[in-house]
Swiss-Prot record:
PANTHER family: DNA POLYMERASE I (PTHR10133), DNA POLYMERASE NU (PTHR10133:SF27)
Catalyzed chemical reaction(s): DNA(n) + a 2'-deoxyribonucleoside 5'-triphosphate = DNA(n+1) + diphosphate; dZTP + DNA(n) = DNA(n)-Z + diphosphate
Keyword match Transmembrane: no
Organism in which the protein naturally occurs: Vibrio phage phiVC8
Protein name: DNA polymerase DpoZ
Domain of life: Viruses
GO molecular function, one term: DNA binding
InterPro entries, sorted: 3'-5'_exonuclease_dom, DNA-dir_DNA_pol_A_palm_dom, DNA/RNA_pol_sf, DNA_polymerase_A, RNaseH-like_sf, RNaseH_sf
Keywords annotated in UniProt: DNA replication, DNA-directed DNA polymerase, Nucleotidyltransferase, Transferase, Viral DNA replication
Length: 633
């Protein structure tokens, strides 16, 4: 929706904003780091075509006016990247009412989770979730493009965003106004256009749900996570020793020294050879081709190998990243006042996130802290602390994605729901194994086992990938699809096909779910979760993944529902610290048992076809103690 911004000259005064049902807000800051940088100016736009830039450097009283406007406000305050604007405003003394905030970036992902997806027909081009791109696409307008040239003329350097945006706070208010006012205007125009699209496409439920979740996540971001910086320095020293051990082991397995980050040297040590048009590593693993025709030896390829050298390379890379990027950079270097302030990606956006709605962390990426490698976890996790005078309580959702899978399959197979009703602690892998007469876990490569069968179905890996995970024979095949794209896939051998057929015969509903989801994705172009989240398949692209994506998106929705319930159950007795994988870490009062009981009861709701279980991990003075981890160093 286009509004006439020129007639007011973009010179809004200290007006009464309470008369508007909606207005937009955008901040200009001295930098991007919360608790370090501050707001030096802000812009506001209203639906009657008024907009204005308020320069705090020249009008410090503008902050007081803004505080008086937002405190009692009952309408909608629209931002693009609301978390950033909220936190930077908070550090500058302005507490925006979180219940009144909306975010055009999050709404954009609800409308289309593929803005930044590259499809075969887009020829390598994709959009993004920036205000500039979305405004161009949906309202036919763009940000003030000359700002970088004007800043370069004033301060020197290249006329690029990266070079010039750090200079914005040094620019005169008249120049900042030319940049800032259009940002607020475009944000409001985009929001108004989104309102029409949301109603037209029936997206009200998921948009309302994400808006409800937003305050909980922003509060957690603003609180940050306490860290023990003295211990973090010790952890870096400990990780140095681990990395040296890893390196020595890797060189011994390779029989030579090499650079694990050099594609050429990695190809050489794994003895990649082309046989009959197929690339193979020295352990016989079939490798995909890169665009240049070379063998692909990325992390996925290394994980698929039986060669112990592959695991050694992955371990070394992971531990170097943990030491240098995570501990040294994000924890020690970027902590402020003994806390780190990671960003929680609520949806896919400018800085990461997922189209399924699954949460992730950046700066630092807390979900990347090793959990299965107990040795590394025991070194890293003591650095993370609960709030002063409280304890760290850790909990885990029991087989969370497996239960979501069971919930969806139970719509076509009531026996699964019945089995869970009779035993809420049911192990689905064991249940499937008993039905099929196969073990839960494999005792040797190539042995059919229920766990890998189930995981293959949950993530919709395809028969060939299931065969590969079971250690059974498979081969690469390829075909050209209707659009002329060459598709390569893993084709299962006879033995794997037989066990997969037996699985579908015994475990009714799994194939029905996959077939039905794929059919709807192809015919309608999208499928939908119970919360109303759309998962789109343009031109039916990769519709065979529909059921797996539905499982992931449903799990993401239920995880966000858990956040709401946990925050409500904690009340004033604690707070959420972080959520990694299927775990919830909380800071709680020392009298933690009744608090835990409230949280457990809130999460274990009876709204799905199978029960959800939240299991207690432990409590302690830091994350490691709560997990029962012991540092052997």
């Amino acid at each position: 929706m286009k509004l006439d911004w020129e007639r007011t000259g973009r010179r809004m005064g200290f007006i009464d904003l309470s008369k508007y049902e909606v207005w937009s807000y955008d901040t200009e800051c001295t930098g991007l780091q919360y608790k370090v940088d501050k707001v030096f100016g802000f812009s506001i736009a209203t639906p009657d075509g008024q907009s204005g830039y308020f320069d705090v450097r020249e009008q410090p009283e503008s902050l007081q006016w803004l505080a008086e406007q937002v405190e009692p406000y009952k309408g909608t305050i629209v931002c693009h990247n609301a978390s950033f604007d909220y936190r930077m405003s908070l550090h500058s003394g302005i507490k925006l009412p979180l219940s009144q905030i909306d975010d055009t970036g999050i709404r954009a992902c609800c409308i289309n989770e593929h803005e930044s997806t590259i499809f075969p027909w887009t020829r390598g081009r994709a959009g993004d979730y920036s205000l500039d791109y979305l405004a161009k696409k949906y309202v036919g307008a763009q940000k003030y493009a000359e700002i970088y040239d004007e800043l370069a003329a004033l301060f020197g350097g290249k006329a690029t965003r990266k070079t010039q945006m750090p200079n914005l706070y040094r620019a005169p208010s008249g120049l900042v106004r030319k940049y800032a006012c259009p940002d607020a205007e475009l944000t409001l125009e985009l929001w108004l256009e989104q309102e029409e699209l949301i109603k037209k496409r029936g997206l009200e439920r998921i948009v309302a749900f994400e808006r409800k979740v937003m305050p909980t996540l922003i509060r957690t971001e603003a609180r940050g996570v306490r860290v023990d910086l003295d211990y973090a320095e010790q952890a870096i020293f400990k990780m140095d020793g681990v990395v040296r051990e890893n390196q020595a082991k890797m060189f011994a397995l390779a029989g030579r020294e090499f650079n694990p980050n050099s594609p050429k040297q990695v190809r050489e040590v794994f003895g990649a050879k082309e046989e009959g048009g197929v690339w193979k590593s020295r352990d016989g693993t079939i490798l995909e081709r890169t665009a240049t025709g070379n063998p692909c030896l990325d992390a996925d390829a290394l994980r698929s190998m039986t060669d112990p050298l592959a695991a050694a390379v992955l371990e070394l890379r992971s531990n170097i990243k943990t030491k240098d990027t995570f501990l040294a950079k994000h924890v020690v270097e970027h902590s402020v006042g003994g806390r780190v302030y990671p960003n929680i990606n609520q949806m896919k956006g400018e800085d990461g996130g997922t189209g399924t709605g699954r949460l992730s962390y950046t700066g630092p990426a807390l979900q990347q802290i090793p959990s299965r490698n107990k040795r590394i976890a025991a070194i890293i996790k003591p650095a993370f602390l609960p709030e002063e005078g409280q304890l760290w309580l850790d909990s885990d959702m029991a087989s969370f994605e497996v239960r979501i899978f069971a919930h969806l399959v139970a719509a076509y197979n009531p026996a699964i729901a019945k089995a869970y009703a009779e035993n809420p602690e049911l192990d689905l892998h064991q249940w499937v194994g008993d039905l099929m007469g196969i073990p839960r876990n494999a005792s040797y490569s190539g042995q059919p086992n229920a766990k890998q069968m189930n995981l293959g179905m949950i993530f919709n890996r395809g028969d060939g990938a299931v065969a590969d995970s079971l250690g059974m024979p498979w081969e690469w095949c390829e075909f050209t699809d209707k659009k002329g794209e060459l598709i390569r896939y893993k084709k299962a051998g006879r033995e794997a096909k037989s066990i997969i057929a037996a699985y579908h015969s015994q475990i009714q509903g799994v194939k029905t779910l996959a077939t039905r989801a794929q059919k709807i994705a192809e015919e309608r172009g999208w499928i939908q979760t119970a919360h109303g989240r759309r998962l789109r398949f343009p031109n039916g692209y990769k519709s065979y993944k529909a059921s797996g994506i539905l499982i992931q998106a449903t799990a993401a929705d239920e995880n966000k529902e858990n956040w709401l319930r946990i925050e409500d159950a904690l009340g004033s007795d604690g707070s959420m610290i972080l959520n990694t994988h299927d775990s919830y870490s909380m800071s709680v009062d020392e009298n933690w048992k009744p608090i835990w009981e409230r949280v457990k009861k809130a999460v274990e709701r009876q709204t799905l076809r199978v029960p959800l279980l939240l299991e207690f991990d432990g409590v302690g003075k830091n994350w490691a103690e709560a997990k029962g981890l012991i540092d052997v160093h």
